[in-house]
Every structure is written in structure tokens, then in C-alpha cells.
Amino acid sequence: MTIKDIAREAGCSVGTVSRVLNHNPTVRAATRARVTAVMQQYGYQPNANAKHLKQHVREGLALVIKGTQNALFADLLDKLQACVEARGYTPTVYYINEASDEMATVQMICTERRPHGIFFIGSHPHCFTPALANLGLPCLLLTNNAAEQHIPNLSSVSVDDRAAAAALITRLARRGHKVIGIIGGDPADSRPSQRRLSGCRDAMAQLRLPFDFDTQYAFADFSMEEGYQAAGQLVDKCPGLTAIFAMSDLMALGAIRALQDRGLRVPQDMAVAGYDGIVLGRYTVPRLTTIRQNTTVLAERAADILLRCIEENAPAAHEIVPFEWVEGESV
């Protein structure tokens, strides 16, 4: 009788059986009782030497962060680390750039670390292929919805970007803004930009607001510098512009500075709204109005879902968490 046999009979993962053997307190009582009953039924006795050798690597989780300049991801990472450490796991963080191959990164991590599971923050769903299922360990994507990928071991937790962007445009319209410019990434390459642009289009169509992509959309790479440049482009090419929606808070802060450098007052001459709800936006002048992604809820739900997959062999799950409107002073 091997540990794999015990896991199969108990209906859980090998990692969960290992945690029971190591007396890890994070295993749920019902799961521990089920595993213990199977071991007693078959008279299973663990190999003490093997247990000692493997114990130090059995509690590992990998956290893969795509993009090193994103303030939202930094906050999310801190809270996610705290969540998994409280459950008895040791996270190892890997930073990858925008051009990195997630599947190659996963193969490297599994070869070097043999983790229980992997979190991805900031990756795009299309980066994952069905080959991910062959690795045999639970994975979870944060900040993007992976339900449409139909990969059996890939879960996701995210905000509904489309609905959030639509809600923001609706609020701007209710305050009298009819010509609204948008700063965002390339919708062809960025899933968040695509979803948020779709939400903007939904609201504008419903409210019968004008929208011309060529004059009312400016490309930027989610940084303050790019937001600064994009805001200037919108002012130059879009007559009648009275409000700007930037698809990240950092771009919004850059946009505000660009407008001020041109002698425009925010919000008296031009309203600016962001997206993410990072801490920095609370301390700018004016204080930033934005859509907040609640990083505490995102981290808690992500940790709970992935650890259920690890400890209880639960199926992949895809959860949408609520977004929040943050009333600042920039609209």
C-alpha cells in the first residue's frame, strides 16, 4: 500500500495524505478522519526516513507574477502570501516579464521545486494550454477569468472587468460627461483592456454617447509615463473631451499630471477616473476616483479555492468577486 493508494481510496490528493502524515493542522478534520480511517483499514505504516527527507519540500507553493511595475500586483502578492502562510504553506515567488512563456515557467518550477500548487498573477488566460492538465497539480489565475479555457486543473478569481468599466462610464455620464476618452492597453493583446473596452462600449451604446476609437482611445502600457503621454494625445485629437477613463490608477495619475502641465484643472476642466484602487491614489491631489479591486477578498478567495483543490482534491472553480466604486476628488 503506497501513499498514492491511500489518496485514491480516501478521495483526496497525495499532498493531503502527506499533510496528514506530517500532522499539519491546516487539514480539515473530516479529511483527516477519512485519510486516517483508510490507513487503519489497510494497516499502512509510513516510511519514517522517506518522510523526513521529503517533509521540507511538501508544503511549497509557487507564486508567479507577470509584470514587476504593477502596484496592484504588489499589494495582491503581499496579501496572498499572508493567506497561504497562515494555512501552513511556504510560498516561493517568481517574477516573469511580459514576454515570458508561462508553460515553460511551470515546467521549470515543477522540475526544481515540486510544489503543491501554483498561483499566477497578471497572466493572460490564452497563455495556458491543455498541456497544463498533464502536470497533475492545481493552478489558479488571479485578476483574469480562465473559465473559457476549460483546463481541468486551472481555477481563477477575478473582478468582472466588463461590468466594472460599464458602471464607471455610466457614472461619468450621469455627471454630465458626453465625450469620454479612454486610456488602455492594446485590446488585441491585453485581456483586461479588451474586457474593459467592451464594458465602455456597452455603456456608451446604451446611453447613446458618441465613441470613435481613433479619436477617443489612446494606447498605453499601464505606467504613469505612458498615461501622461496618452492623456496629451487625447486632448490633442478629441475636441469636446471632458472626461478620461484610464484603465489603471497609475495611468490615471500620469494623465492628471499631463493635464495639469497643460494648465487644465482636474476635475473642473477635465474629469479623470482610474481602475484598481491602489493605495497611492488616496494621497494624490486631487484624490483619485476609481474602481477598486478588493485585493483582500481576491487573495482570500484565491487561497481558499487553490488549497481546497490541493487538500480535498476539489475540482477547479472560477469566481467573480465584487468591484467597488471609490469616490475621490478627480471627477
Indicate residue ranges for each PLM-predicted region.
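Alpha-helical recognition/docking segments in bacterial nutrient-uptake
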Residues: H56-T170, D236
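Flexible loop/turn connectors
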Residues: L154, A230-V331
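Short beta-strand segments enriched in small/hydrophobic residues
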Residues: V14-T16, L53-Q69, R171, V179-D186
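Periplasmic-binding protein-like
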Residues: R114-I121, G181-G184, Y217, C238-S248, ...
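N-terminal helix-turn-helix DNA-binding module of bacterial transcription factors
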Residues: M1-R58
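Hinge/beta->alpha junction and helix N-cap segments in small-molecule ligand-binding domains
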Residues: I65-D75, V93-D101, S156-A167, I183-A230, ...
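Short acidic capping loops at alpha-helix termini that bridge into adjacent secondary structure
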Residues: K178-V179, F211-Q216, V266-D269
